[in-house]
């Protein structure tokens, strides 16, 4: 029996981060966490592309643009922050962004991690951005690198 498992190493990996700017300081914490993790795990700055988009809704179309650009990425990390408000806007955006990221990952057979915070309130969002707890940008980058390594082994 063969068992395959990826290792979270950025050495020789070409990775992109697509990060939304909306909900600025929280979104910035996710992108910064992902960037620093890439470097801490042996990645070279010239192998990391960071693209900032206005909001989370713009993440999927930007992912598709990167995926069809001719540059071969090993993985992509999608970072954004959606905080529930009083209308249904949050539900529509969260559902569509999540579904499209998953579809693109399957269509292009590439690890694209979902580091988009979907939180009921700003305090919960901060908890997922590393200020009061874990950082989804960090865990998203680690998962992306582990999956990229696994895909190379399969």
Curated annotation (Swiss-Prot):
5-amino-6-(D-ribitylamino)uracil binds at residues 22, 56-58, 81-83, 114. Belongs to the DMRL synthase family. GO terms for cellular component: cytosol; riboflavin synthase complex. It catalyses: (2S)-2-hydroxy-3-oxobutyl phosphate + 5-amino-6-(D-ribitylamino)uracil = 6,7-dimethyl-8-(1-D-ribityl)lumazine + phosphate + 2 H2O + H(+). Pathway: Cofactor biosynthesis; riboflavin biosynthesis; riboflavin from 2-hydroxy-3-oxobutyl phosphate and 5-amino-6-(D-ribitylamino)uracil: step 1/2. (2S)-2-hydroxy-3-oxobutyl phosphate binds at residues 86-87, 128. HAMAP family: Lumazine_synth (MF_00178). Catalyzes the formation of 6,7-dimethyl-8-ribityllumazine by condensation of 5-amino-6-(D-ribitylamino)uracil with 3,4-dihydroxy-2-butanone 4-phosphate. This is the penultimate step in the biosynthesis of riboflavin. The active site is at residue 89. One of its GO terms (biological process) is riboflavin biosynthetic process. Keywords: Riboflavin biosynthesis, Transferase. Signal peptide: none annotated. The keyword Transferase applies. Pfam families: DMRL_synthase. It comes from Chlamydia caviae (strain ATCC VR-813 / DSM 19441 / 03DC25 / GPIC) (Chlamydophila caviae). This is 6,7-dimethyl-8-ribityllumazine synthase. GO terms for molecular function: 6,7-dimethyl-8-ribityllumazine synthase activity. The keyword Transferase applies. InterPro entries: LS, LS/RS, LS/RS_sf. PANTHER family: 6,7-DIMETHYL-8-RIBITYLLUMAZINE SYNTHASE (PTHR21058:SF0), 6,7-DIMETHYL-8-RIBITYLLUMAZINE SYNTHASE DMRL SYNTHASE LUMAZINE SYNTHASE (PTHR21058). Its EC number is 2.5.1.78.
């Amino acid at each position: 029996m063969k068992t395959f498992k990826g290792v979270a190493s950025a050495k020789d990996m070409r990775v992109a981060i697509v990060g939304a700017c909306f909900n600025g300081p929280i979104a910035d914490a996710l992108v910064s966490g992902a960037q620093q993790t890439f470097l801490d795990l042996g990645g070279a700055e010239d192998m990391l592309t960071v693209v900032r988009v206005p909001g989370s809704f713009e993440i999927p179309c930007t992912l598709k643009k990167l995926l069809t650009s001719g540059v071969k990425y090993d993985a992509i990390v999608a970072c954004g922050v959606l905080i529930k408000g009083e209308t249904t806007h949050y539900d529509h955006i969260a559902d569509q962004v999540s579904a499209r990221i998953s579809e693109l990952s399957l269509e292009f057979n590439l690890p694209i991690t979902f580091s988009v915070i979907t939180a009921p309130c700003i305090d919960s969002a901060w908890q997922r951005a590393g200020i009061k707890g874990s950082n989804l940008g960090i865990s998203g980058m680690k998962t992306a690198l582990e999956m990229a390594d696994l895909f190379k082994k399969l």
